[in-house]
Amino acid sequence: MKGTGKRKKLRTALFIAAGAAAGLAIWFGIPYSPLRDGFGKDIKRITADSRYHTDGGIITEEAIGHLPEAVKKCIRHCGFIGTPVMSYMKMGFHDVAFSMGKDKPTLNIDYTLYDFTAEPCRMAFIDSSMFGVPFQGYDYYENGSGGMKGVLAKAFTVVNETGSSMDKACLVTYLSESMCAPSILLRNDITFEETDEHNVRAEMTYAGQTADGVFTFNDEYEMISFTSDDRRTETDADGNEHFIPWTVKCGGYKAAENGVLLPAKMQIVWNYPDGDLVYFDGEVGSIVYG
């Protein structure tokens, strides 16, 4: 009788374990997640908010007249003159090689970002998995406050970074993407210094934070890189923040459906003293303006 009882308990335990495993498989497999749902609701809310709508019109020579010559040449070469002043840009990447850091694993991720132009605002969503377990991330910047959240198994928050350094990092990331959404460049809170015919330093001040970096252009005046010292790479055990150069690289410019030239490839790099770490390496799947 005792043996029969033990077997029943074992069968019950196995049944419960199998049910839990099946439940997890279903939970992991469905598209829904609380973080993704929050991202979608934020995008819907922001796109409906009139503060984030431009006044319309088109990008003209007169509108870009105050910009440095290299920036004007970039806007002209890429075909933005005569196109609508966009309220936002949506950029999508698929199967990006994403490094978790030095001597850490590399994941394949899907990445979707929105840059809004009437007010500095950036939202981005990471979708990936680690050993079959969903891993998702959400980068957000709105009203001068930014953060980064990472969630494992759609339920457990493993990264949740906020603070002034994150605010500044989000602002400089927003600035780095402005050549692909040139309505941003028409704002009066960005100043420029043309250091030579192929390099322009840009400084943006918003909500009490200032971030800057250098845009570099090739001979065709396609933007090929943006480098800044305003991104924190780590905080040590004593609470000291460490900053090293951070670079966005663009290339492979192609004509989009609306005729403008846009980069097809993008890398994001930490320029460590002992060598570069390319932590984001992917091809641009789509760019949509609204």
Q: What name fits each language-model region?
A:
Residues 149-208:
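Flexible, processing/modification-adjacent segments and terminal tails
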Residues 86-90, 117-125, 194-203, 224-225, ...:
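Short, hydrophobic/aromatic-rich segments at coil-to-beta transitions
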Residues 2-21:
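N-terminal Sec-pathway targeting helices
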Residues 72-156:
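N-terminal mature ectodomain segment of secretory-pathway/periplasmic proteins
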Residues 111-117, 138-140, 188-195, 214-216, ...:
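Short, exposed beta-strand/loop patches in secreted or surface proteins that constitute
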